[in-house]
């Protein structure tokens, strides 16, 4: 038996016991420490343990909104420690952002050195999902992909190739790599913000923007905060301290959530409505504010369409074309009390149609695409209430009313606190008190999260919330407004990102809408919502009018699916249909990844990507206004490569395949573009100028006014603040808050009316009964006893870190589903039992956790565990269908038009009901 000294034991064990670090020795080197060493005291060991030869910038390039700057320490080519950098510049009179981090981020090294790491290219030899692979060389794997790419273009069409990668803000160089490749070969790319259900569609409908939100330091400026469907102490850990500090500063905080979650236990008041009834609660608050005249009338007149006139005969806006020969259909009227006449206000869409039309751009309208002009009213005093007579162009006299008159009459009749109490379960007295407090505290803020966003009618709910901010005049003020923190969606330097990802311009890129793409190609057309909504009809109309894309064109099936930086299959709603109907259509599935996740498991070729600490990229978020970077602490381990280098290498192999097959060029008639596959590498690298990751990162910075002048060397020194932003200007030492361009500077809102638009006079909105904010109950197509919820976990970022041993040790060691103690007793279920949860869409079999904070009639399974993790069958998405809301298909209505991640159908993983029973059957040896 080999003898080991105490020093040898300490050094060897240090390789695995450093918690948030690793020994500078590799495990292989540690094996050599079994020989005898002369004992010379313990002090030098501790000194050496924290010594390093390299210190670099690091960030965690995952679908996380933290964007937490870190330092990474390495020695002899091994990362030994990671820690928060604590060097974000402070705001004036505001608590610091520093240090930023959470339990997940400090596990980043686990994916470098853990068993999850992909080391070599792999090619499947068994069935998809079976887990049988063989090691391949890079040349073999890339040639296999390149041959299929060229053959698909030649024999089918370039848009039969599909490239998916989400959230560009966290790693824009990596994101741009595959999108630039798709751009030059004619493939289509995917939306993600809407597919995840995170896109605030109601904000786009109301405000004409993809979205915008205050950085979290601005929470401290608020005097009253409502956490509505948001659980920031669990899902926004780096920023939650601003809430506690605001409380200490006198801010009152209210949580509106069905369950008694980790944020609810820390607030001043907890309101717990029935799931999905938040719209009734919001509109009953509006009832109180209007009834008691607590609203800001001037704000409604200037900043909203509530003073615009609506025809009583057609229910449409009164347009200039109705009254004046040759008048515009995009100019509208209000009633001027001072003159007693109808007046067209400044800022309507028709004022400058060439500047108002939404540009053909990635992620829609942002930053430099807003209209010119002003919306100040001058001497005009618009009427909010009343009925007036107007003579039309044909001589006919009709009655018109301001939008506010119509809205008020409905809310007064339909949305009393007493009626809302019966729907929500919240007492009328509590609703009235909440409304008064919110309306009278200045400034007041609503923070909304996924709990309000992932519903079939989430757009109408968000419009109701925006109505509250409009009534109180809190939008565009520090400490106020409606701020949504759902998803990692905001690449502030968007023009630079677009320049790198789509060099010939977004107008020459095929964008598919992922919800529609999945609905069509996974053949979930049998997901009938109810007898009142004909989804297929609206979908056909959207395709016929080209309001929404249907890719591949001409009814073809997708053939090649390249996925990177995203666990697409694991996140997919309609998972049963995806595996049964979509996956067999795909002749090649490629996954580029740092680890073997569920999507990789069901792929044909898996390519190993460099870890976040082995590559150079940028990292930004909507939660603060600073740019981070990550840079190589060590060279990419094993045979991994950065995403940028992988797609450059693939482009070279496509060139070779095209030359081999004699198919170097083809005419893409849609774009009148003769594509040259034999020159792909030069196109990808701009003739070599972008051959390195660092050059690509600097290119992004240089091509956006928000970051021009910022260099990588400056980012190595410390995080740099953006110089400009989207809907407000940047002010030194002041937290960013959105919409000041419109509220303070009086620029027109980028909507059809030039204001926050609450009345949407489009046929589809009339069909659905949602031309104004109304309460719409959850869709209950599945008649089962429990409402299913899939919240985000404290111990993972979506599926990332779900399989980290360090995180599993902090919980039950695997996925589980929560149920109330009363419901569990009724079902005869005990804590940690195996249970079967099912509906018409699928099933999941997992452990159960009895949680006293869970509401009766609801069960919650933490979002997207890996499909191979202690699950007998299915996952959290197995019971979720793909459902399309018809209003999300509207296009060519002013600001409502499809643009990737700007407007389109979203995910509806909350309108789901399930049944549950104790599982009787064989169970694996597990936690």
Swiss-Prot record:
Signal peptide range in chain numbering: 1-31
The UniProt entry's GO biological process terms, in alphabetical order, are: cellular respiration
One annotated GO molecular function is: 4 iron, 4 sulfur cluster binding
Applied use: Has potential use in bioremediation of waste sites contaminated with perchlorate, a common component of solid rocket fuel which is a widespread environmental contaminant in water systems in the United States.
Q: Which residues form the 4Fe-4S Mo/W bis-MGD-type domain?
A: 53-116
What is its induction behaviour?
A: Transcription of pcrA occurs only under anaerobic (per)chlorate-reducing conditions. The presence of oxygen completely inhibits pcrA expression regardless of the presence of perchlorate, chlorate, or nitrate.
* Enzyme Commission numbers on file: 1.97.1.-
UniProt cross-references to Pfam families, sorted A to Z: Molybdopterin, Molydop_binding
Task: Say which enzyme class the record assigns.
Answer: oxidoreductase
- Give the record's GO CC terms: membrane; oxidoreductase complex; periplasmic space
* Localization, UniProt: Periplasm
Q: Which Cys pairs does UniProt list as disulfide-bonded?
A: none
Keywords attached to this Swiss-Prot or TrEMBL record, sorted alphabetically, are:
4Fe-4S, Iron, Iron-sulfur, Metal-binding, Molybdenum, Oxidoreductase, Periplasm, Signal
Tell me which domain of life the UniProt entry assigns to the organism this sequence originates from. Bacteria
Give the residues the record marks as binding Mo-bis(molybdopterin guanine dinucleotide).
198
Question: What does UniProt say on post-translational modification here?
Answer: Predicted to be exported by the Tat system. The position of the signal peptide cleavage has not been experimentally proven.
Q: How is the cofactor bound?
A: Binds 1 [4Fe-4S] cluster. Binds 1 molybdenum-bis(molybdopterin guanine dinucleotide) (Mo-bis-MGD) cofactor per subunit.
State what the entry records as the consequence of deleting this gene: Deletion of the pcrA gene abolishes anaerobic growth in both perchlorate and chlorate but not in nitrate, indicating that the pcrABCD genes play a functional role in perchlorate reduction separate from nitrate reduction. Deletion mutant strains are still able to grow aerobically.
Which function does this protein serve?
Answer: Component of the perchlorate reductase that catalyzes the reduction of perchlorate to chlorite and allows anaerobic growth on perchlorate as the sole electron acceptor. Is probably also able to reduce chlorate to chlorite. The alpha subunit is likely the catalytic subunit.
Query: What is the protein name stated in its UniProt record?
Result: Perchlorate reductase subunit alpha
